[in-house]
Protein backbone atom coordinates (compact mmCIF):
# COMPACT_ATOMS: atom_id res chain seq x y z
CA UNK A 1 0.00 0.00 0.00
CA UNK A 2 2.81 2.40 0.90
CA UNK A 3 4.49 1.75 -2.47
CA UNK A 4 1.28 2.49 -4.36
CA UNK A 5 0.73 5.71 -2.40
CA UNK A 6 4.33 6.79 -3.04
CA UNK A 7 3.94 6.15 -6.78
CA UNK A 8 0.87 8.42 -6.96
CA UNK A 9 2.41 10.99 -4.57
CA UNK A 10 -0.54 10.87 -2.17
CA UNK A 11 -0.49 10.72 1.62
CA UNK A 12 -3.63 8.64 1.98
CA UNK A 13 -5.49 6.32 -0.36
CA UNK A 14 -8.31 3.82 -0.14
CA UNK A 15 -8.23 0.31 -1.57
CA UNK A 16 -11.50 -1.61 -2.01
CA UNK A 17 -10.97 -5.36 -1.92
CA UNK A 18 -12.82 -8.66 -1.85
CA UNK A 19 -11.22 -11.22 0.44
CA UNK A 20 -12.06 -14.51 2.06
CA UNK A 21 -10.36 -13.30 5.24
CA UNK A 22 -9.09 -9.70 5.38
CA UNK A 23 -6.77 -10.63 8.26
CA UNK A 24 -4.69 -12.89 5.98
CA UNK A 25 -1.95 -11.60 3.63
CA UNK A 26 -3.08 -11.03 0.06
CA UNK A 27 -0.39 -13.47 -1.07
CA UNK A 28 -2.38 -16.31 0.55
CA UNK A 29 -5.00 -15.97 -2.19
CA UNK A 30 -8.75 -15.31 -2.17
CA UNK A 31 -7.95 -11.61 -2.38
CA UNK A 32 -8.81 -9.18 -5.17
CA UNK A 33 -8.45 -5.41 -5.53
CA UNK A 34 -11.58 -3.80 -6.95
CA UNK A 35 -10.69 -0.12 -6.82
CA UNK A 36 -7.99 2.29 -5.62
CA UNK A 37 -9.10 5.77 -4.52
CA UNK A 38 -6.63 8.65 -4.17
CA UNK A 39 -9.21 10.57 -2.13
CA UNK A 40 -11.07 7.95 -0.09
CA UNK A 41 -14.46 8.79 1.35
CA UNK A 42 -15.17 8.13 5.01
CA UNK A 43 -18.82 9.07 5.49
CA UNK A 44 -20.09 5.57 4.72
CA UNK A 45 -17.92 4.25 7.53
CA UNK A 46 -19.16 6.87 10.00
CA UNK A 47 -22.82 6.43 9.07
CA UNK A 48 -23.27 3.01 7.44
CA UNK A 49 -26.70 1.91 6.23
CA UNK A 50 -26.20 -1.37 8.11
CA UNK A 51 -24.05 -2.05 11.14
CA UNK A 52 -22.11 0.11 13.57
CA UNK A 53 -19.98 3.15 12.78
CA UNK A 54 -16.21 2.75 12.48
CA UNK A 55 -13.95 5.72 13.21
CA UNK A 56 -11.95 5.47 9.98
CA UNK A 57 -10.82 9.15 10.10
CA UNK A 58 -9.38 8.52 13.56
CA UNK A 59 -7.49 5.47 12.32
CA UNK A 60 -6.14 7.42 9.35
CA UNK A 61 -4.94 10.25 11.58
CA UNK A 62 -3.35 7.80 14.04
CA UNK A 63 -1.47 6.09 11.21
CA UNK A 64 0.05 9.39 10.07
CA UNK A 65 0.49 11.09 13.46
CA UNK A 66 1.26 8.52 16.14
CA UNK A 67 1.76 11.16 18.86
CA UNK A 68 0.56 14.79 19.14
CA UNK A 69 4.10 16.00 18.42
CA UNK A 70 3.90 14.49 14.94
CA UNK A 71 0.64 16.25 14.13
CA UNK A 72 2.13 19.68 13.49
CA UNK A 73 4.93 21.28 11.51
CA UNK A 74 7.84 23.04 13.27
CA UNK A 75 7.29 26.80 13.47
CA UNK A 76 9.63 29.67 14.30
CA UNK A 77 7.74 32.90 14.97
CA UNK A 78 9.15 36.37 15.48
CA UNK A 79 8.46 40.07 15.12
CA UNK A 80 11.52 41.07 13.12
CA UNK A 81 12.88 38.06 11.24
CA UNK A 82 15.10 39.25 8.39
CA UNK A 83 15.70 37.66 4.99
CA UNK A 84 19.32 36.98 5.99
CA UNK A 85 18.25 35.08 9.11
CA UNK A 86 15.62 33.17 7.16
CA UNK A 87 18.22 32.21 4.54
CA UNK A 88 20.54 30.94 7.27
CA UNK A 89 17.75 28.85 8.81
CA UNK A 90 16.83 27.44 5.40
CA UNK A 91 20.43 26.48 4.61
CA UNK A 92 20.84 24.78 7.98
CA UNK A 93 17.67 22.71 7.80
CA UNK A 94 18.60 21.63 4.27
CA UNK A 95 21.88 20.35 5.73
CA UNK A 96 19.81 18.31 8.18
CA UNK A 97 17.27 17.14 5.59
CA UNK A 98 17.91 18.03 1.95
CA UNK A 99 14.31 17.23 0.96
CA UNK A 100 12.45 19.28 3.56
CA UNK A 101 10.01 21.85 2.19
CA UNK A 102 10.54 25.27 3.78
CA UNK A 103 8.17 28.23 3.85
CA UNK A 104 8.58 31.66 5.38
CA UNK A 105 6.61 34.88 5.69
CA UNK A 106 8.84 37.94 5.81
CA UNK A 107 8.27 41.66 5.43
CA UNK A 108 8.36 41.36 1.63
CA UNK A 109 5.94 38.42 1.47
CA UNK A 110 5.76 34.64 1.20
CA UNK A 111 8.74 32.52 0.16
CA UNK A 112 8.85 28.80 -0.58
CA UNK A 113 12.25 27.11 -0.44
CA UNK A 114 13.92 30.52 -0.58
CA UNK A 115 12.05 31.58 -3.74
CA UNK A 116 9.67 34.57 -3.54
CA UNK A 117 6.08 33.49 -4.13
CA UNK A 118 3.63 36.28 -3.37
CA UNK A 119 2.73 39.15 -1.07
CA UNK A 120 -0.92 39.55 -0.23
CA UNK A 121 -2.17 42.75 1.39
CA UNK A 122 -3.78 40.55 4.03
CA UNK A 123 -1.49 39.03 6.65
CA UNK A 124 -4.20 36.43 7.18
CA UNK A 125 -3.98 35.31 3.56
CA UNK A 126 -0.18 35.15 3.64
CA UNK A 127 -0.17 32.89 6.69
CA UNK A 128 -2.95 30.78 5.18
CA UNK A 129 -0.99 30.32 1.93
CA UNK A 130 1.87 28.81 3.95
CA UNK A 131 -0.07 26.67 6.42
CA UNK A 132 -2.56 25.33 3.88
CA UNK A 133 0.16 24.29 1.47
CA UNK A 134 0.38 20.50 1.86
CA UNK A 135 4.09 20.64 0.96
CA UNK A 136 5.03 22.92 3.89
CA UNK A 137 7.15 20.98 6.40
CA UNK A 138 8.84 23.85 8.26
CA UNK A 139 7.57 27.42 8.64
CA UNK A 140 9.08 30.73 9.72
CA UNK A 141 6.45 33.41 10.35
CA UNK A 142 6.98 37.11 10.96
CA UNK A 143 4.20 38.85 12.91
CA UNK A 144 4.46 42.62 13.40
CA UNK A 145 2.36 44.55 15.94
CA UNK A 146 -0.05 45.77 13.25
CA UNK A 147 -0.53 42.23 11.94
CA UNK A 148 -1.27 41.05 15.47
CA UNK A 149 -3.74 43.87 16.14
CA UNK A 150 -5.57 43.28 12.86
CA UNK A 151 -5.39 39.50 12.42
CA UNK A 152 -3.89 37.75 15.44
CA UNK A 153 -1.48 34.87 14.84
CA UNK A 154 -3.65 32.43 12.88
CA UNK A 155 -1.73 29.40 14.12
CA UNK A 156 -1.34 27.50 17.38
CA UNK A 157 2.07 26.85 18.85
CA UNK A 158 5.66 27.74 18.04
CA UNK A 159 8.83 25.81 18.74
CA UNK A 160 10.95 28.97 18.86
CA UNK A 161 9.85 32.58 19.38
CA UNK A 162 12.28 35.41 18.58
CA UNK A 163 11.37 38.81 20.02
CA UNK A 164 13.63 41.60 18.77
CA UNK A 165 13.03 44.80 20.78
CA UNK A 166 9.39 43.81 20.74
CA UNK A 167 6.38 46.08 21.14
CA UNK A 168 3.74 45.19 23.74
CA UNK A 169 1.49 43.41 21.22
CA UNK A 170 4.42 41.46 19.81
CA UNK A 171 5.35 40.19 23.27
CA UNK A 172 2.09 38.23 23.25
CA UNK A 173 3.89 35.79 20.94
CA UNK A 174 5.29 34.28 24.13
CA UNK A 175 1.88 32.66 24.56
CA UNK A 176 2.47 30.65 21.38
CA UNK A 177 5.43 28.75 22.85
CA UNK A 178 5.03 25.01 23.16
CA UNK A 179 5.82 23.39 26.50
CA UNK A 180 9.50 22.89 25.67
CA UNK A 181 9.74 25.87 23.34
CA UNK A 182 12.67 28.27 23.26
CA UNK A 183 12.23 32.01 23.78
CA UNK A 184 14.89 34.35 22.40
CA UNK A 185 14.54 37.94 23.61
CA UNK A 186 16.69 40.69 22.12
CA UNK A 187 16.80 43.97 24.00
CA UNK A 188 19.26 46.75 23.27
CA UNK A 189 22.51 44.81 22.72
CA UNK A 190 21.66 41.70 24.73
CA UNK A 191 20.28 38.30 23.63
CA UNK A 192 18.65 36.20 26.34
CA UNK A 193 17.61 32.60 25.70
CA UNK A 194 15.09 30.89 28.00
CA UNK A 195 13.20 27.62 28.18
CA UNK A 196 10.39 27.16 30.72
CA UNK A 197 11.42 30.46 32.36
CA UNK A 198 14.95 29.14 32.92
CA UNK A 199 17.67 31.35 31.44
CA UNK A 200 19.93 29.20 29.27
CA UNK A 201 22.25 31.94 28.08
CA UNK A 202 22.70 35.69 27.90
CA UNK A 203 25.00 37.15 25.24
CA UNK A 204 26.02 40.68 24.25
CA UNK A 205 26.43 41.85 20.65
CA UNK A 206 27.63 45.06 19.01
CA UNK A 207 26.08 45.21 15.53
CA UNK A 208 23.29 43.68 13.44
CA UNK A 209 25.58 41.17 11.74
CA UNK A 210 26.84 39.86 15.08
CA UNK A 211 23.27 39.70 16.36
CA UNK A 212 22.08 37.41 13.58
CA UNK A 213 25.17 35.21 13.85
CA UNK A 214 24.51 34.76 17.57
CA UNK A 215 20.81 34.08 17.02
CA UNK A 216 21.69 31.45 14.44
CA UNK A 217 24.26 29.83 16.72
CA UNK A 218 21.49 29.54 19.33
CA UNK A 219 18.96 28.10 16.88
CA UNK A 220 21.27 25.64 15.09
CA UNK A 221 21.42 22.91 17.76
CA UNK A 222 17.64 23.08 18.16
CA UNK A 223 16.72 22.64 14.50
CA UNK A 224 17.59 18.96 14.30
CA UNK A 225 15.63 18.35 17.50
CA UNK A 226 12.42 19.98 16.27
CA UNK A 227 12.66 18.64 12.71
CA UNK A 228 13.00 15.05 13.94
CA UNK A 229 10.17 15.12 16.47
Task: Show where each model-derived region lies.
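ATP-dependent carboxylate-amine ligase catalytic core
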Residues: 75, 81, 90-182, 186-228
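ATP-dependent carboxylate activation and anion-phosphoryl transfer catalytic cores
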Residues: 1-79
Amino acid sequence: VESIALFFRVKCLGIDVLAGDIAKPWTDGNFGIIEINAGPGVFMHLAPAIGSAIDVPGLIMASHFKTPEYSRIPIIAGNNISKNLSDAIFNKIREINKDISYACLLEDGVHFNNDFFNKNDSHYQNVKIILRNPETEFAVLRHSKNDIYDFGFLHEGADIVILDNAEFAEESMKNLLLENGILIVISDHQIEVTRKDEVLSSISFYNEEDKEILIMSTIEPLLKEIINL
